């Protein structure tokens, strides 16, 4: 059975894209400006005095607070003579006792502190007396609660999600004829040597 071959497909030729070249606009050149050389005066180096080192530093300070309104009472004093620091501080604790700390610090013994606690000179601050829970002369009354209608119970139903359905595309079928098979012709190669006879 003879089946004719299908007609060859003819395609349109490929069209290359072409772009227009950008327009070249010549702008007048700006006039050349030369900056005049101005001599710059160099700043004179500032004389920096090195911080003086005190081989035997000394200081002394102190303060004191005595506030009768808040009950805050404290003091501190400290002095330094070379590498030895001595000082003390004191404060009134909540129970009315006075705590005093004497301390020293030197290169040989390090930091040492001695704590003294003295009984209070001031009367301890009395704790506040709580007020009675029910004031005197209180009359108990009963008040009816306002009538409130109960709100209706709303039961929310959650709807199932709606899924969109789509039809499948039809299957594209293309009929192709079986290729005709024929033996390829035998190609004979002939070689030529253009320089074969040319010897120098």
Swiss-Prot record:
GO terms for molecular function: structural constituent of cuticle. Sequence repeats lie at residues 20-23, 26-29, 43-46, 126-129, 144-147, 150-153, 159-162, 177-180. Pfam families: Chitin_bind_4. Keywords: Cuticle, Repeat. Residues 70-89 are annotated as: Disordered. It comes from the Eukaryota. The tetrapeptide (A-A-P-[AV]) repeats found throughout the protein are also present in many proteins constituting the protective envelope of other species. PANTHER family: CUTICULAR PROTEIN 76BD, ISOFORM C-RELATED, STRUCTURAL CONTITUENT OF CUTICLE. Component of the cuticle of migratory locust which contains more than 100 different structural proteins. This is Cuticle protein 19.8. It comes from Locusta migratoria.
